[in-house]
């Protein structure tokens, strides 16, 4: 998704075909060395036998395994309904109502405007998702529901999901490329020149991007150490949501925000240590002077044909020993990740401009650009972000 809170999120991301550049030779990815078809392994052959399933259901130990797998399969099957239950809970503001007080069903129905019988079904579903709980005749907010309305940007993101779900309504046509994804034009509209026609929409999604960027910044700065940095430059940093968090942690650290001129014209100079550097990383060189450059939720917004030249420009801008920090949701590679390889991979595909990449793919691109000492700190929350550091040799 767009990485920050204003037009810089899209202005350097005009739609281009995904994968127009050469794909890294990572196993399982386009462009990888060919591999001959193999045999189905033993355990999978067992799982393909209906007769063995029936036998395992009767065995004291094996029935636990089959039951657990059955529950996992049904969780996948019912996933869309779960997401729609969550959207309904958000739209009826159930969690916010319960954050103020616990209510019996009749009074809760009055506050939501729903008929009691339908609200009862919704509340049971929300309780099954552990968002709410029922105690002593009252519906109450559960810890998970409290966390949901507390995490910045999460509720707004759920409200945004129908745009993505409309694109995925026919997944066969979507994957074959037979439809024009609505999401591909959504963010350029929200943060582009037409946004002046719907200022409320732009403001709402600007806040969403700023909120989500703060969460990414928090996780990123827990994984990297900037105490020895002389100047940090955030490339494609929008109006500065990431650097704002950096400034709070390192108030004396000089900062540079690099983005398009019209983006910087609405950015807030929140620190006396902050400099603006207008430019386009597509068309202009990256300014020199920073020994740490950050790319936060930038790479997955762009195809390889944009990312590879960008990494080369960053390498040229850094001094020897300078560091590049990349922070974004990354694919799992050899160990597929449920959040990134399902949600973010399909989200970026619907945007029609970028793709999620595994750490190994990014490492290969960095080495091709001339970087050395590529490392990946242990990820705190891969569904929020992962971090890769690299050094100019």
From Swiss-Prot:
Pfam families: Dimerisation, Methyltransf_2. Its EC number is 2.1.1.210. Keywords: Carotenoid biosynthesis, Chlorophyll biosynthesis, Methyltransferase, Photosynthesis, S-adenosyl-L-methionine, Transferase. It catalyses: demethylspheroidene + S-adenosyl-L-methionine = spheroidene + S-adenosyl-L-homocysteine + H(+). Residues 26-36 have a biased composition (Low complexity). Disulfide bonds: none annotated. Pathway: Carotenoid biosynthesis; spheroidene biosynthesis. Residues 1-36 are annotated as: Disordered. S-adenosyl-L-methionine binds at residues 259, 297. Belongs to the class I-like SAM-binding methyltransferase superfamily. Cation-independent O-methyltransferase family. Methyltransferase that mediates the O-methylation of 1-hydroxy carotenoids. Converts hydroxyneurosporene to methoxyneurosporene or demethylspheroidene to spheroidene. Also able to produce spirilloxanthin. This is Demethylspheroidene O-methyltransferase.
